[in-house]
Amino acid sequence: MSNRTVFFISDGTGITAETFGNAILAQFEISPRHVRLPFIDTVDKAHQAIRHINHTGELEGKRPIVFTTLVNMDILAVLKAQCNGMLLDMFGIFVAPLESELGIKSNHRVGRFSDASKSKAYDERIEAINFSLAHDDGQSHRDLAGSDVILVGVSRSGKTPTTLYLAMQYGLKASNYPLIPEDFERRQLPPALVPHRKKIFGLTIAPERLSQIRNERRPNSTYSSLANCRNEIHEAEAMMRREGIRWLSTTTKSIEEIATTILQEIRPERLEY
């Protein structure tokens, strides 16, 4: 049974909704299509999500299943009132309604997963992690073409933890490459990155936060001074604008939020599987 779509909706990254929903769905012998809709944090976004869900139901001729971890009650109320899918809140009772909706009995086994698919996904993630480690901080130019995404930004802007999270959570081969003063002087991307421009995504950060982070590593140095951080960030953002590189600020975002935002931009299909 595969012609059924399951949505995971959250006003955050959606990881909790997806994890919880998948734990419930693993009790059933089905292989549905998964769609994660993160950052549904306004009524307008809720309406967009509702249109997506309802349209999917019309196309498939079956109600989509919708797991949600929405915290905002106004947004949740809109979803409950207008969504034609089977809506399951995190705090509801899940298994019994799914038995009724799917027309099959739950296996009632804890932690039941498809061994073959999980093994393949596990192998892909290990391969992605090894790739990301080998291509951390520009240490290898070899096989950059094999990257799913190449993160660029100044030192300590969050590139390494984000690439590793993308590899571990999504199996993406994520490289990262530092932008350094020599690049700013040449006013060009590092030569190794030029052929892969379409795969590049930039990270920036508030100079004050960057200075704080760098001071933990190299206190009272030119490298960590606020003036130097301001200059590097200014030059890096100017380069990204010149090169037409998409970028975001990591200043107030968690690694999960950064990774999910990047995924939405460069590989939205990875939110469906």
UniProtKB/Swiss-Prot annotation:
Domain of life: Bacteria
Pfam families assigned: Kinase-PPPase (PF03618)
GO MF annotation: an example: protein serine/threonine kinase activity
InterPro entries per record: Kinase-pyrophosphorylase, PSRP
EC number: 2.7.11.33, 2.7.4.28
Keyword Protease among record annotations: no
Residue positions binding ADP: 153-160
Alphabetical UniProt keywords: Kinase, Nucleotide-binding, Serine/threonine-protein kinase, Transferase
Catalysed transformations (reactions): [pyruvate, water dikinase] + ADP = [pyruvate, water dikinase]-phosphate + AMP + H(+); [pyruvate, water dikinase]-phosphate + phosphate + H(+) = [pyruvate, water dikinase] + diphosphate
EC class (word): transferase
NCBIfam families referenced in this protein's UniProt entry, alphabetically: PRK05339.1 (NF003742)
HAMAP family: PSRP (MF_01062)
Family indicated by similarity: Belongs to the pyruvate, phosphate/water dikinase regulatory protein family. PSRP subfamily.
Known role: Bifunctional serine/threonine kinase and phosphorylase involved in the regulation of the phosphoenolpyruvate synthase (PEPS) by catalyzing its phosphorylation/dephosphorylation.
Name this protein carries in UniProt: Putative phosphoenolpyruvate synthase regulatory protein
Record organism: Polaromonas naphthalenivorans (strain CJ2)
Taxonomy of the source species: Bacteria, Pseudomonadati, Pseudomonadota, Betaproteobacteria, Burkholderiales
